[in-house]
């Protein structure tokens, strides 16, 4: 909210419509900031989730087992004390219900960082029949590379194979220094992070539709 207020204070941005795009914790932030803003025209939530305590509980279980669940109320209390009720007593679902913005939800079924039960499934259950919402669910794009092209995926797979050969054929060890050396020599960032043109076109079309309303 503070970041948006800052942007709105800059004269050259004041006549522009506000649209949001967030991934993971950024997706959580996008959904929740809608509780505080009525001027957002459109928003995209990629691999996001509904409430922070859900993800804290999930990550706690991964690290410490089911017993971590008993600490969830204390973690929620810590968040409430540190960040205040304004930011912790809300959810993305509540924010999405308060806005008239066009919304796109993007997730992948195999996401193990933010499983779809904490985000996509909840959002679809609440808003699946709404014309304001577009839902994009992939099968196998994981968490970090949801919005990259098929060519980028293929390039990344080949890059990983080349890195393995670089290490083993030269008698090197797998370590951060060797990987950095390899990437500095061979990584083509434009190819590796090329966005998915089909998804980008859908996002731009939604932004255009809601920004002229």
Where are these regions (language model features)?
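Hydrolase active-site cap/lid region
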Residues: 32-85
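Active-site nucleophile elbow and catalytic-triad environment of alpha/beta-hydrolase enzymes
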Residues: 79-95, 101
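Acidic catalytic loop of the alpha/beta-hydrolase fold
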Residues: 110-114, 143-145
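Short beta-strand/loop motif that positions the catalytic acidic residue
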Residues: 99, 105-107, 111
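Short alpha-helix in the alpha/beta-hydrolase fold that links the catalytic acid
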Residues: 101, 115-125
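C-terminal catalytic histidine-bearing segment of alpha/beta-hydrolase fold enzymes
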Residues: 130-213
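Alpha/beta-hydrolase fold nucleophile elbow
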Residues: 12-24
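Alpha/beta-hydrolase active-site loop
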Residues: 1-11
């Amino acid at each position: 909210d503070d970041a948006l207020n800052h942007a709105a204070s800059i004269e050259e941005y004041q006549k522009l419509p506000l649209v949001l795009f967030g991934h993971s914790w950024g997706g959580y932030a996008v959904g929740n900031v809608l509780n505080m803003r009525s001027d957002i025209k459109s928003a995209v939530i990629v691999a996001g989730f509904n409430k922070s305590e859900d993800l804290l509980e999930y990550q706690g279980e991964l690290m410490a087992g089911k017993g971590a669940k008993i600490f969830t109320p204390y973690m929620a209390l810590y968040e409430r004390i540190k960040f205040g009720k304004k930011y912790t007593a809300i959810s993305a679902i509540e924010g999405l219900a308060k806005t008239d913005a066009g919304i796109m939800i993007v997730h992948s079924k195999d996401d193990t960082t933010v499983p779809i039960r904490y985000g996509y499934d909840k959002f679809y259950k609440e808003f699946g029949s709404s014309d304001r919402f577009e839902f994009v669910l992939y099968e196998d794009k994981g968490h970090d590379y949801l919005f990259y092209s098929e060519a980028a995926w293929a390039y990344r797979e080949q890059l990983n194979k080349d890195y393995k050969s670089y290490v083993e054929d030269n008698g090197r060890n797998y370590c951060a220094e060797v990987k950095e050396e390899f990437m500095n020599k061979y990584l083509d960032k434009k190819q590796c992070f090329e966005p998915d043109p089909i998804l980008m076109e859908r996002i731009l079309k939604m932004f255009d539709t809601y920004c002229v309303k």
